[in-house]
Design a protein with these regions (language model features):
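C-terminal regulatory
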Residues: 2-100, 127-128
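A late-sequence structural motif
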Residues: 92-128
Length: 128
């Protein structure tokens, strides 16, 4: 995972050049922002609730908020690099991990077709 933003965001709010600059920026959070803040502290970023102006339990909504230039998003490199409008923010820092859970109802996992899709998604999300 890395931070990504579109040109519109960078033009409006400026480019963060070091970890300390990130506290002056807005982010969109997927899921529980407190948990994400905890993971980000592990990579040296001191962010708080005020930095997360937007939050959603839908990654599509998170993506659109960032794509419209309203916030920086945390994205998987494999996905973000397929969209030229997104550029890495603080590209020099090492990619970091945030646990991602891929879940399905137990009944769906017994279907061979669903299991195949599930396994393909798991491989793609893990970077295999």
């Amino acid at each position: 995972m890395r931070f990504y933003a579109v040109d519109e965001y960078i033009t409006r709010y400026g480019t963060p050049h070091q970890n300390g600059d990130m506290s002056a920026h807005q982010f969109v959070s997927f899921g529980d922002f407190e948990r994400i803040v905890g993971y980000l502290k592990l990579v040296g970023l001191d962010l708080s609730q005020k930095n997360f102006r937007y939050a959603s339990n839908s990654q599509l909504v998170e993506w659109e908020i960032a794509r419209k230039g309203h916030a920086i998003a945390i994205m998987n490199d494999n996905i973000a690099t397929k969209f030229p409008e997104f550029q890495p923010v603080l590209a020099e820092i090492e990619p970091f991990s945030i646990p991602v859970w891929l879940v399905a109802h137990r009944e769906l996992q017994t279907s061979r077709r669903i299991r195949l899709v599930f396994d393909i998604l798991a491989d793609a999300l893990s970077g295999r």
